[in-house]
C-alpha cells in the first residue's frame, strides 16, 4: 500500500499548532505553504538576520502531511483538530504517493544547469557537458543555492561578466557557497563567504573543497573589516535594506556591488536606500526577480 499526503487549509493562527499536533499523532512529515502562492495575494515571510520571524504561517496556510499506509486521514485530522481545540476538522484532500526508489527519483530531477555564457552547475552523479566551461559541482542540499532559482542565476551571470582576475570578493549570505565558488573560478582572490547559518557555512566549506576553490567562510562576526572590489548579496529585500550601510561600507570606492533576492516590484525601494552611497540600478530581470548593480562613489 502506498503512502498518502493529507492536504488541508487553515487560518494563520492555527497552522503551526495543527502541524505540531499532526506530528505528535504520527504523521511522518508536515510542511506549511502559502495557499496563495503564485497569485497576487502571495505573502513573502522572512525574518531579519539572526532573528526569528514574527509570523511562521500565512493568512491562508496549506498544511501538507505525509501519512504512513496504516493511518486513516480523516481520523488523524479529527484528532489533530480536537488536540488544538478547533470546533471541527478542516476540509481536506488526499493524494497517493507511490513508493519508489527515492534516491534515484531525486537525482533524476536535477540535471546539469547552464548559466550565462560558460557556466555549468553539475550534480555529482552527472558528467560535465563541457569540460572547458566554468564547472561547479554542486548537489541539492540544505543550504540555498544550486543555480536553479532566478536570483542565484542572476548573480552568477553578473559575476561572470564582472569579476576580473585578482579582484577581492565578498559573498554576504553565501548559502551553499555557489557564488563565492564561482567568483574564485573566475579568478577572484581573495574570496570570502559569510552567512548567519552555521550549517550553511559548513555546507559551503564542503562545496568549496569539492570544487577545489579556496574560499574563506565564516559567520557575520568573522567578516573581514576591510573593503572589497566586489560585494554580492543574494538575500531578501528587507534584510538588504537594513544592512545597506554595512554592505556598502565593504565596497571599495569605485568597487561594485550586486544585490538580489529582490522582486521586481521591490527594486525601486531597495535602490533608493542604496543610492545614498551607490550609483545603482536594475542590471537584469528574470521571472519577476531582479539583480541590482552599482558602483560605490569615490570619496571626496
From Swiss-Prot:
- Keyword check for Lyase: no
Tell me where in or outside the cell this protein is found: Cytoplasm
| A Pfam family that the UniProt record links to this protein | PrmA
Which Gene3D superfamilies does this chain map to? Vaccinia Virus protein VP39
State a GO cellular component annotated for this protein.
cytosol
Q: Name one GO molecular function term.
A: protein-lysine N-methyltransferase activity
Q: What is its EC number?
A: 2.1.1.-
Task: Specify whether Methyltransferase is a keyword of the entry.
Answer: yes
List this protein's GO terms for biological process. methylation
Q: Can you state which reaction this protein catalyses?
A: L-lysyl-[protein] + 3 S-adenosyl-L-methionine = N(6),N(6),N(6)-trimethyl-L-lysyl-[protein] + 3 S-adenosyl-L-homocysteine + 3 H(+)
Which keywords appear in this protein's UniProt record, sorted alphabetically? Cytoplasm, Methyltransferase, S-adenosyl-L-methionine, Transferase
Query: What family does the entry list?
Result: Belongs to the methyltransferase superfamily. PrmA family.
**InterPro entries reported in the protein's UniProt record:** Ribosomal_L11_MeTrfase_PrmA (IPR050078), Ribosomal_PrmA_MeTrfase (IPR004498), SAM-dependent_MTases_sf (IPR029063)
**Protein name (database record):** Ribosomal protein L11 methyltransferase
Which parts of the sequence bind S-adenosyl-L-methionine?
Answer: 152, 173, 195, 234
Name the PANTHER family for this protein.
ELECTRON TRANSFER FLAVOPROTEIN BETA SUBUNIT LYSINE METHYLTRANSFERASE (PTHR43648:SF1)
Disulfide partners: none
State the gene name recorded for this protein: prmA
Q: Which domain of life is it from?
A: Bacteria
* Species of provenance: Paraburkholderia phytofirmans (strain DSM 17436 / LMG 22146 / PsJN)
What job does this protein perform?
Answer: Methylates ribosomal protein L11.
